[in-house]
Amino acid sequence: MMENYKHTTVLLDEAVNGLNIRPDGIYIDGTFGRGGHSRLILSQLGEQGRLLAIDRDPQAIAAAAAIDDPRFSIIHGPFSALGDYVRERELQGKIDGILLDLGVSSPQLDDPERGFSFMRDGPLDMRMDPTRGQSAAEWLRNAEEADIAWVLKTFGEERFAKRIARAIVERNRELPMTRTKELAEVVAAATPVKDKFKHPATRTFQAVRIWVNSELEEIEQALKGAVEVLAPGGRLSVISFHSLEDRLVKRFMREQSRGPQVPAGLPMTEAQLQKLGGRELRALGKLMPGEAEVAENPRARSSVLRVAERTGA
């Protein structure tokens, strides 16, 4: 079924341009999806170049079979482990660029069987990798009301989190929810004030999805791994799609660009300062999609691209 879902890659050229591709370089596409970024990277690599892709979605792994290129390989797993994948291949410090396209992809959103969207009814799943972990339905059925409320507030910034959590628990007590439509209806009924521009279940679905997939923890680990394995001058290009992701990426790049903070006037020798380490990254700025891209692909509206370069020698 997956071939029925068209995926338009957001900030395609900008994200790949941010990598400053060298024809003989080694690159990582940490979120293969349907291969938009990977194909563009491969088109800019020479015969000696290499591209390692990663994705935890089995459908993405299946889609990658269409790329018959000796310079390309793909790993089925979370991008949080990219540091491990690189070390296993003895490539640490040799990676010239890493691209991460965060969040859920259009094929995942548009396929009702994946359970990511309330727009069409489907199983209440939401897992990036349906072969691992608890589904959204299982977690909501077993979680405490206070924990559900915390997730909705923290990862969905939902102001009616407590009311919605109570309604979810009460509904599951009567008859456990198994469908996306059921969750959307429960949330809508529990929301006293409706936003005329946004479905009342939008924030709840985002929060549950982030929690079920440990998305923010995955991003943090991936960013740390990227800094560890990038070569000096290597680029990190990251696309985020909502404020929680972008704040995390922005904070990480800012902190890694600062280096250790030493109080002014603290007596330290040059050798002691060197032991503390210098800054790991140099932030190169951010880009947002233009009006033409947003008009063609409305899902690009909230996207932000941030690029940084590995420092040191």
Curated annotation (Swiss-Prot):
Location in the cell: Cytoplasm
Binding positions for S-adenosyl-L-methionine? 35-37, 55, 79, 101, 108
Could you tell me the EC number(s) of this protein?
Answer: 2.1.1.199
Q: Which GO terms describe its biological process?
A: rRNA base methylation
Record's catalysed reaction(s): cytidine(1402) in 16S rRNA + S-adenosyl-L-methionine = N(4)-methylcytidine(1402) in 16S rRNA + S-adenosyl-L-homocysteine + H(+)
What UniProt keywords are attached to this protein's entry?
A: Cytoplasm, Methyltransferase, rRNA processing, S-adenosyl-L-methionine, Transferase
Q: What is this enzyme's class at the first EC digit?
A: transferase
Cellular component, GO, one term: cytoplasm
Molecular function GO terms recorded: rRNA (cytosine-N4-)-methyltransferase activity
- Coarse class of the protein's main subcellular location: cytoplasm
Q: Give the function comment from the record.
A: Specifically methylates the N4 position of cytidine in position 1402 (C1402) of 16S rRNA.
Q: What family, per the record?
A: Belongs to the methyltransferase superfamily. RsmH family.
Q: Please give the name of this protein.
A: Ribosomal RNA small subunit methyltransferase H
- Tell me the organism: Cronobacter sakazakii (strain ATCC BAA-894) (Enterobacter sakazakii)
